[in-house]
């Protein structure tokens, strides 16, 4: 099941071919390298877009990262816990 969070994170992301893709992020003083993005979607909030990314790190942990274009910030919004 997922645990809902709203933790600010630092993200290194690549923007190419009109696509934004997170590459790694820092959460709780630990760097997680994204091994794959399993899904991405966006939601319009007023005039701004909120982008969501379901990602898996190198240790097969599953996270949902959220990028707010208006605030230009990232948060860790969900983490898979067993």
Question: Which role does the model predict for each range below?
Answer:
Residues 1-82:
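Cysteine-centric segments in proteins
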């Amino acid at each position: 099941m997922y645990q809902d969070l709203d933790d600010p994170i630092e993200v290194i992301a690549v923007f190419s071919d009109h696509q934004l893709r997170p590459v790694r992020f820092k959460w709780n003083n630990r760097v997680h390298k994204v091994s794959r993005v399993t899904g991405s979607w966006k939601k319009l909030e007023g005039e701004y877009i909120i982008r969501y990314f379901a990602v898996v790190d190198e240790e097969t942990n599953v996270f949902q990262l959220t990028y707010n274009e208006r605030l230009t910030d990232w948060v860790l919004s969900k983490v898979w816990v067993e």
